[in-house]
A protein has these predicted regions:
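Mature catalytic core of soluble alpha/beta enzymes
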Residues: 2-8, 12-350
Length: 350
């Protein structure tokens, strides 16, 4: 399950680091199982119970009726099995809007984030729990059916026609939880909520500030030691998403294969990174960028950050390299507190 172990650690640290100043009467917490992971939602304020009820319903609807690749009644399943025929969606439907966002991010990252890798992920067994190493010929054939150019999406006054060409299929797992967090944020705002923490299986959103006015403090997991952490981030109104090699992997003949695939090769990305944490004001972007930056490697990730900043999309990074360094961007200079006992070398980037 993607980021499930990360979810547990983040939840533990989030609760332990933010509890000061809060009382049980001021908050409501609910644990939800959706999107193949355990989610922990905590909402503060008078409308907390009603807001959580709405949030849980929204999550189950997204999971079961919209985004599941395997549930035959879901919209994504129907699209993936449409055999090249155009599927019409309403103007307010969630799935085409999410696909549009995924295509936009794929273009912005020059394909480092690619939502069309469904058949390649299946071949590796990461979506089926039947792990294996595909042959080079098999990967070459599967990759010929990937690429966002095979997704035709239009937005009209009446709705969204979507067509998948040449056997293309979508896997939105790299963006779905972030997008869901965006929707939950909007739902909570409608309910009048101003303070909350949403941990959607490791995709964490801290809404507003704590009720005492201070920032939330979230621990970032150590990819080499799942019982420890790299450091603590102070944040308000931010999404914090981590992608790492420890989340889903298997070993064969002494080689470890992780689930973050390079869209160009169809193989696990070898970028010099073992973990990427993104902090951003948008959940879908944070989710997808964590994957893209991992694929791009340190230099590519930092170049992408600069490019997107020029276009009005700002985000911060914590990069863990395979030689034991932790690189964090200048926007975190006062917000990230390294764990000096972790054994890493920390570098604040100018």
């Amino acid at each position: 399950m993607k980021r499930q172990l990360a979810a547990l650690l983040l939840t533990i640290f989030a609760l332990s680091l933010t509890a000061c100043g809060e009382t049980a009467a001021e908050s409501e917490t609910r644990t939800v199982y959706a999107m193949d992971t355990v989610m922990n939602l905590t909402v503060y304020g008078e409308n907390a119970a009603a807001a959580l009820e709405s949030a849980e319903k929204e999550l189950h609807t997204l999971d079961e009726a919209v985004l599941s690749r395997t549930a035959e009644g879901s919209e994504l399943y129907a699209l993936n099995t449409s055999n090249g025929e155009t599927v019409e969606y309403g103007a307010d439907d969630i799935l085409p809007a999410l696909i549009e966002t995924a295509l936009t991010i794929s273009d912005a990252t020059d394909g480092a984030f690619d939502p069309t890798l469904a058949p390649v992920l299946d071949a590796w067994g990461f979506t089926k729990d039947e792990r294996r190493v595909p042959s080079a010929d098999e990967l070459k054939e599967l990759l010929s059916h990937t690429g966002c150019g095979k997704v035709v999406l239009e937005k009209t006054a009446d709705g969204w026609p979507v067509t998948l060409l040449d056997g293309a299929q979508l896997d939105l797992g790299g963006i779905a939880k972030g997008y869901a967090a965006d929707l939950l944020r909007a739902q909570l705002e409608k309910e009048g909520v101003t303070s909350a923490t949403l941990d959607l299986g490791g995709d964490v959103f801290v809404m507003g500030r704590k009720t005492d006015g201070s920032d939330w403090r979230i621990a970032v997991k150590d990819p080499a030691d799942t019982e420890s952490y790299l450091g603590v981030v102070s944040a308000a109104d931010k999404f914090i998403v981590t992608s790492g090699v420890y989340e889903r992997y298997f070993e064969e003949n002494g080689v470890r294969y992780h689930h973050i695939l390079d869209p160009k090769t169809g193989c696990p990305a070898e970028s010099g990174l073992v973990s990427v944490t993104v902090l951003c004001e948008n959940g879908a972007w944070a989710d997808a960028l964590s994957t893209a930056c991992f694929v791009l490697g340190p230099d590519g990730a930092l170049a992408l950050r600069d490019d997107l900043a020029d276009q009005g999309t700002d985000f911060e990074l914590i990069l863990v390299t395979d030689d034991g360094r932790v690189l964090y961007t200048d926007g975190l200079a006062d917000a990230f507190t390294p764990n000096d006992e972790s054994g890493y070398t920390y570098e604040a980037l100018a």
